[in-house]
Amino acid sequence: MTLSDSDLELITTELGRELTPAEAALFENLWSEHCAYRSSRPLLQSFTTGDDSANDEGAEHVVIGPGDDAAVVRLPRVDEASETPIYITMGIESHNHPSYVDPYDGAATGVGGIVRDTLSMGAYPIALADSLYFGSFDRERTQYLLDGVVEGIADYGNAIGVPTVAGSVEFHNKYTGNPLVNVACIGLLTDERLVTAEAQSPGNKLVLVGNATGRDGLGGASFASEDLSEDAETEDRPAVQVGDPYTEKRLIEANEELITAELIQSARDLGAAGLGGASSELVAKGGLGARINLERVHQREPAMNAMEILLAESQERMCYEVHPDDVETVGDIAAKYDLGYAVIGEIRDGNYVCTFGDETVVDVPAGFLADGAPMNDLSATEPPTPEESTFPAIDAATAFNTIISTPNTASKRWIYRQYDHEVGLRTAMRPGDDAALIAIREAGVGLALSSGAVPAWTESNPYKGAQAVALENATNVAAKGATPIAAVDCLNGGNPEKPAVYGAFKDIVQGLADMCHTLSIPVVGGNVSLYNDSTSGPIPPTPTLALVGTKKTFDAPPAALTGDGTLLLVGHQSNNLGGSELLAQIGGTDKFPALPSNPTAVVDSLARVANHPSTLATHDVSTGGLAVTLAELITSDAGARVTVQNKTSLFTETPGRAVIETTDPDAVRHIFEGVAPVVSLGDTTTDGTLTINIDDEDTANESPAVTTDAATVAKQRRILEDALE
């Protein structure tokens, strides 16, 4: 990738001279789509971010919104009289292209990068969530990528001691040439520990702490701003970073000590565009400049030139602004943790200047470098959405057995059992449920976390599908009794220069923004990843959302039946099958299901039901519809006898619904009165069997439409384990 003629003309006109090679490379990376959001930034104004405290609903929780390394959200407290506010940080990143070229290192360094974004704010990382998207599971290449990505996430996350507690995995043939790896991180801090990525004062020193700089990851930002080529695995390997989790662990602990000692004025991790990106963005945000001596950067490879030192994306490095009086102490702490350390320059008024030997290799206005890229004016065409119902007939038993044994509905235990999800002793609800639940004892609240998207939904109808993604994640945390308070997004799309691709991308942005606004959930930060396009075509528009909610306890009803209650289905239901797993398996098209007109009331009511003492189990209805929800709820000790109105009721994926096991059905009906329908499904049993009757088919037939048991279902849902073990 090189600078376009128009960009080059704009830059040389601004500077009044030709660019040095280092400047050209720096602008190429910082003005890339990956760094500058040239095709998406105007669209992001649709989101309610909480920055406008007077007008944004949900803003009372937002301390720092979009624009920093991570967002900062104030947690509500059980004891409101406490004087110490407790904050969490929220961040999400993509490492899509690197994970195709090198799935292990690509995914591992994705984890490392989002953790360092957390460190930049003065927070300690306490939880990870990973949302992964791959091509058709039956392909050998897909299984290779899945195996490598999961191993990379597990090895890195486990080694640094941060639990991976939530996430999602989706398979769709349009990810075959371009998988997605989206990783979110939650951090914890108090208000006095808060640091930002905004340079504070001229005269302060810039200090580099962490790994030595090598040549790995060169041009990573520009690499992430192009379609993947057929030869990407070999040609683009140098653009993929190599991680060292044990250095990252030492960096986490050193950062904690530096923040505790109040030695850090501002901070930024070295991610996209390396030292050049981190240092220029830090001073630009403060309206300042810097003078950096590149020869002072500690290096692990010989004869590195200025451009390589500036742009290498070697991992496990932090750039700190430090008062001159504190520089020696920072060096002592770095040495204590066996970390590299170098005073590379200082913050000044004026330009961003880098020297190498006796030569000035960069001398540009920091604000122009960081924020001067012009936005793209791209054409967009409205994506077609199905309007007719055309799909083959299929009997309920065949449909049920088909739908519970697909890669998308299969058990993901093979994946999350590789993650240490309990390190840190905060995990109150483990992976495999609707949402994770993390104990924030400092505030006396439980923090529920859900992350994911459903590409079949957004492919069927980008706008409504994105709305459904937001509602689905909100429903997940509500099903565990939590009230949503904030979210971050990772907006993944194909090549935006294709009008159809850009049109669908615009729709997912607007759909996600509209539903989050309706739910009063501020989207406090995020990431955009475009050019997820390859020789096999663009990916489906994929709006990953990581959403948190809070509750006053550290426990929640599980997504597993007890055998002691009545089963109810709560929420509005549409009989359309658009975007469903059933249609993905049997073929055909249908309209996307209608969404509830009162989603906030539905989510609030579900949270109240989940916290009611009569509630024994809760599980939201999502991919695979009610059929999969019921299959996931039964255990060897608890089954169910269920009756539904029609076959479509089993397979529609209308979001905003949940199955409740309760000993007091009237209490559930009272809570949902005037909000959404409450349908009696039947009773639970203690024999581990599931029988489903369908009213409109079985009136003259005494045998159930579906009969199965927990052992059979578990075997059918083992397809990932059977293929990969």
Curated annotation (Swiss-Prot):
SUPFAM superfamilies: PurM C-terminal domain-like, PurM N-terminal domain-like
Gene3D superfamilies per record: PurM-like C-terminal domain (3.90.650.10), PurM-like, N-terminal domain (3.30.1330.10)
A GO MF term: magnesium ion binding
UniProt binding sites for Mg(2+) 1: E93, N527
Main enzyme class: ligase
Positions annotated as active site in the UniProt record: H34, H95 (proton acceptor)
Pathway the protein contributes to: Purine metabolism; IMP biosynthesis via de novo pathway; 5-amino-1-(5-phospho-D-ribosyl)imidazole from N(2)-formyl-N(1)-(5-phospho-D-ribosyl)glycinamide: step 1/2
GO biological process, one term: 'de novo' IMP biosynthetic process
Main location: cytoplasm
Ranges where the record places region Disordered: 220-241
Superkingdom field: Archaea
Chain sites annotated for binding Mg(2+) 2: D117, D269
Binding residues for ATP: Y37, D489, G526
Binding site for substrate: S94, H95, N96, H97, R116, Q241, E313, S314, Q315, S529
Catalytic activity: N(2)-formyl-N(1)-(5-phospho-beta-D-ribosyl)glycinamide + L-glutamine + ATP + H2O = 2-formamido-N(1)-(5-O-phospho-beta-D-ribosyl)acetamidine + L-glutamate + ADP + phosphate + H(+)
The enzyme's E.C. designation: 6.3.5.3
CDD domains noted in UniProt: PurL_repeat1 (cd02203), PurL_repeat2 (cd02204)
Annotated PANTHER family: PHOSPHORIBOSYLFORMYLGLYCINAMIDINE SYNTHASE SUBUNIT PURL
Family membership noted in the UniProt record: Belongs to the FGAMS family.
HAMAP family: PurL_2
Biological role stated in the UniProt entry: Part of the phosphoribosylformylglycinamidine synthase complex involved in the purines biosynthetic pathway. Catalyzes the ATP-dependent conversion of formylglycinamide ribonucleotide (FGAR) and glutamine to yield formylglycinamidine ribonucleotide (FGAM) and glutamate. The FGAM synthase complex is composed of three subunits. PurQ produces an ammonia molecule by converting glutamine to glutamate. PurL transfers the ammonia molecule to FGAR to form FGAM in an ATP-dependent manner.
Matching NCBIfam families: FGAM_synth_II, PRK01213.1
Name of the protein in its database record: Phosphoribosylformylglycinamidine synthase subunit PurL
UniProt organism field: Haloquadratum walsbyi (strain DSM 16790 / HBSQ001)
